[in-house]
Amino acid sequence: MPHNLSRADAIVVTLSGEEEISDDLTAKIREFNSECPIFAARRVISGFVEILPGGLSDTADGGIGCDDDATDALTGRVLAFCGLANPQNFFSEIERRFALAAVEKFRDHHNYTQSDADALTKIARGCGAEMLVTTVKDAVKLGGLSFGLPCFAAKMEMAVEDEDAFREFITASF
């Protein structure tokens, strides 16, 4: 790995829960490459799609049984759930945008059942949540399940923190 760092023209560090690149990590990178720019990136929510009753299916417009960009429909308290190996970034992103009533973690690659959907709805109602939010990765596993509350999938994308400097670096490289 150090050899690869020494050859890099730029380094992009993916932040997962951290607010910024630590001084220790920057110092470690600089041991192997003293000149290249270091950029920070993180996964952020770019929008939401509503998961419709009846499950997920291909649609003519390329959707997956959901209403495209339902971001405006999301107001109120939220129960967030997912089956990710490291769910903290997802939950943090939801908490930045909404009043987070509760979170429910499932094991990575969880296969959801109607019992899960019923339990999530019960927990959500018990803590005053008005809707459920999950990841697109999890949404594709919710086909045929019915929730007693609106359920949305968060679309995620990578965002570079100093986008102008990153764009300038990329443009100057060509």
Where are the regions that the model predicts?
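C-terminal accessory "lid"/substrate-recognition subdomains
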Residues: 1-131
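Switch/connector loops and helix/strand junctions flanking conserved nucleotide-binding motifs
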Residues: 21, 141-142
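A short, gly/pro- and small-residue-rich
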Residues: 26-35, 142-161
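Short, flexible loop segments at boundaries between secondary-structure elements
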Residues: 46, 107-110, 149-174
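Long, hydrophilic "mature protein body" segments
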Residues: 81, 144, 167-171
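Short, polar loop motifs at secondary-structure junctions
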Residues: 87, 136-141
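Short secondary-structure transition/capping segments
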Residues: 113-116, 144-146, 166
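Conserved active-site loop/cleft motifs that coordinate metal ions or position small ligands
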Residues: 131-136, 152-154
